[in-house]
Amino acid sequence: MNNLVNKTWHLAKNEEETKLTDFEFQLWRVFYGFTRWQEGCEKVANQTDLTGSELSLLHIIRMKDRSKTINELTRLLNRDDNFNVNYSIQKLIKNGLIRKILSDKNNKKAFSYEITEEGIKNTDAYTALRQSILIELLKKKKELNLEKFTDVLSELIAIYEEADRTVLTYMGDKPEVSKKLKKQ
C-alpha cells in the first residue's frame, strides 16, 4: 500500500470508505494498464491498432475454438453496451479476423461469429509475444497467487453487479429520494 497517496477524497469520509476508494483507484489503474498492455502487445505482434475492447472480443471468439453469439459475447465479457460490441465486431469482420455465420439452419436471423485463419494467425502472434513478456514477468512474482486473486475478482464482480441492480431501482426517483439515501 502506498502511504504517499492523499487519502482525502470526496469518495471517502471514513476508514472503510478510504479502503474501498483506494481499491477502486487501483482497479481503474489496473484496467487502463491492462488495456494499454493489450493494445501495445497487439501493435507489436500484428501491427494493428485494435482497441483493448476489440482484442477482448477477438480472444473470446477464439476461446475453445467454437463460434459465439452476440449474447454469449456480451455475457462472457459482462457487457451491456450492445451497440459498441456490434461496432467492434464489424471492425473485426472488416479486418478479416472473424466472420459471421448462420448458427441455426432453422432460423435465418440467428448468427454467431467465428475466428478466421487470419484471426488465428493474429491471436497466435499475440499469444507468443504475451508468453515471452508478460508470462516471463509473472514467473518472477512467485508470491502472486493468481488463482486466489481470480476468485476474489469473481466475488467483487458479484458485489458490483448487485450494487448496480440496486442503484437501478432508484433510477427515475425524485431528487428528494436521492437526498434521503445520502443521509443513510
Task: List the model feature ranges, each with a label.
Residues 128-184:
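Terminal interaction helix/tail motif
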